[in-house]
A protein has these predicted regions:
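Family-specific signature for flavin-dependent thymidylate synthase
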Residues: 1-182
């Protein structure tokens, strides 16, 4: 599996959203301070603030099992997926019989996602109840963020399963890492 990340819209466009919510000049385009950006990503209770939605990433995932992509495309808020087609009319493709295609066939996907939605997705996909293969994809995404700048590192550090934020598990059958929901 190979993961690459490209930031399409940077944190400088978050400043206008921050200022709009405070009733200030929303036409300002400048990077927020690291402290402000971290407060937006790592707020109390693990819920990122809405201006973080202004930051947009394009994530490329290659050679991932088809069934793993299905786990990701379940997310639909703040994200747009582009997954390799299994259509029968793609004759130059070795996977021409859609009905015979195995779920473990390795395919590629790409998705555009805002930083807020990425943090929400990470909560579900880093949970120990997620399949190891699904967790591996999210871990690779998180690792790639650490290869970016300080802003990307903040997003990467904020990517945690729910038990990392709440110290409780909300799964019907928890893994046992923390106590179940009250």
């Amino acid at each position: 599996m190979k993961v690459k990340i490209k930031r399409l819209v940077g944190p400088e466009y978050m400043t206008g959203a921050l200022r709009a919510t405070a009733g200030k000049d929303m036409y300002v385009v400048k990077k927020p301070t690291m402290k402000t950006f971290k407060q937006m990503a790592v707020s109390a209770g693990g819920v990122p603030h809405s201006p973080l939605r202004a930051v947009l990433y394009r994530i490329y995932v290659e050679d991932v099992k088809s069934w793993v992509t299905v786990h990701y495309v379940r997310h639909h808020i703040g994200v747009q997926f582009y997954v390799k087609s299994q259509r029968d009319d793609r004759k130059n493709d070795p996977m021409v019989d859609r009905g015979a295609a195995r779920q473990d066939t390795e395919i590629s996907m790409m998705f555009d996602i805002n930083a807020n939605s990425l943090l929400t997705m990470a909560q579900a996909r880093l949970c120990l109840k997620a399949s190891p293969e699904t967790r591996d994809v999210m871990k690779a995404i998180k690792h790639q963020l650490f290869e970016g700048d300080e802003y990307d590192e903040i997003v990467g550090n904020a990517m945690q399963p729910p038990c990392g934020w709440y110290e409780k598990c909300f799964e019907p059958q928890p893994c046992g890492k923390v106590k179940n929901r009250s």
